Amino acid sequence: MEINVLKNYEELSSTVADIVETQIKEHPLSKLGLPTGDTPLGMYDELVKRELDWSLVITFNLDVYLMNIDHPESYQSYMRKNLFDKTNIYPDHSHFPFRPTSAFEDKIDGSMGIDLCMLGIGTNGHIAFNEPGSSFESRTRVVDLDEQTIKDNSRFFDSVDDVPKQAITMGLGTIMESEKIVLMANGVNKLNILNVAMNGEVTEDIPASILQNHDNVEVYYCD
């Protein structure tokens, strides 16, 4: 699988924002899978600047921490701050994983699936919060976070002890049913795992490696 190497973070953000913009303009009723974290921040900033019409778009976030949704580091707060409060998307059109998790799957199915799913990748190869060892057939569920993920995400909290230990994540099987997937990665610390995931063995030990089996995946990287 080809990895598109871009010259800097600004180009990465602009390029993936172009993909989302095209999707929304050509298909106003689009269903999008949306990520959180550091990497997509530039993409969201670009999308806000472009003043797109989000009124018919439906979004499904990939994952959420099991924590108070009003906490400043909750992914609900993240999305409101970086995208939802700055666009005309209807609140009823933005969905986060919830319990019972089967009901979240039903919402995706009821919307006829995800058209475009945007992903990041963790240093251990996770996508969404599908940690190493996750079944390729997995659906939305509650998961325990890997020690590496907790350590990596501690930079967002006062201490590693404050990082939630559980999350609800869209499953690998759910993600793979998306019509198109775009994976973005930023930083030299992601290059090795990206190469392993995209060009190595397809194994549940590297959850992102399942993307090799999808027929419409684009990968973008900058250091």
In which residue ranges do the predicted regions lie?
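N-terminal glycine-/serine-/threonine-rich phosphate-binding loop
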Residues: 1-32, 94-95
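Glycine-rich N-terminal segment of FAD-binding domains in flavoprotein oxidoreductases
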Residues: 26-50
